[in-house]
């Protein structure tokens, strides 16, 4: 089921009407009037989309960046790469499922792919911790980036996170140190690196994987810095 934002209500109504006209049970009975109506509604939808999305304010752009239906890292990995081999664990503490990482082929070239993954439904979002990486996630990516650097393999990273996970356990396991080490690792790599912000690029949680040679950004994606002092104090 498609999800709509509050400012997309007119588009939603038009698409519901269009779906009714395109109902397969009605196809045999479609008249020239119906087909003309379908074309007209589709044109109205296109016009509404253009009007709405060319005049978004800052909060609306943030909502679009966080949209439930926005393609996630998993989607791009499955559709852009071949022979993806996922790798897990940081060899210190455990696995962090909020980040996908592994080696793959891109245009017949071996690459390391890393993607912050929010999940596609409630269960997977909980499993992926809503894309908020823990220290073991950053240490996993550091391990793999160093491995790619050793074998001269380029690195492609997909950024989509509201920020690093601010929980007590993450802080106890060295969240700040893990982020700093990840930034340091990215800056020291000798292989080409490209980071693509596909949704949210929140704070140090994003910068830890976005310190690349090239940083690209999707339309209506967001990248921001925030002060987390009060958030940290509230945990202790």
Provide a role label for each language-model segment.
Residues 1-207, 211-225:
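Terminal-region recognition feature
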Residues 225-232, 236:
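Conserved small/polar residues in nucleotide/adenosyl-binding loops
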């Amino acid at each position: 089921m498609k999800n709509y934002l509050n400012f997309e209500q007119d588009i939603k109504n038009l698409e519901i009407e269009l779906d009714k006209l395109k109902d397969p049970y009605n196809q045999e009975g479609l008249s020239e009037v119906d087909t003309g109506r379908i074309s007209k509604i589709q044109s109205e939808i296109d016009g509404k989309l253009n009007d709405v999305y060319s005049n978004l304010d800052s909060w609306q752009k943030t909502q679009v960046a966080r949209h439930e239906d926005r393609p996630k890292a998993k989607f791009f990995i499955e559709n852009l790469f071949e022979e993806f081999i996922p790798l897990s664990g940081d060899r210190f503490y455990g696995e962090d499922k909020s980040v996908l990482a592994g080696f793959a082929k891109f245009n017949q070239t071996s690459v390391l792919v890393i993607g912050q993954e929010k999940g596609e439904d409630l269960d997977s979002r909980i499993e992926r911790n809503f894309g908020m990486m823990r220290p073991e996630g950053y240490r996993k990516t550091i391990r793999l980036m160093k491995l790619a650097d050793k074998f001269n393999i380029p690195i492609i990273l997909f950024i989509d996170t509201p920020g690093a996970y601010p929980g007590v356990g993450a802080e106890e396991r060295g969240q700040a140190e893990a982020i700093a080490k990840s930034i340091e690792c990215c800056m020291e790599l000798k292989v080409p690196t490209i980071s693509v912000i596909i949704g949210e690029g929140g704070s140090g949680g994003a910068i830890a994987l976005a310190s690349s040679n090239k940083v690209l950004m999707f339309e209506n994606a967001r990248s921001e810095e925030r002060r987390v002092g009060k958030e940290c104090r509230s945990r202790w």
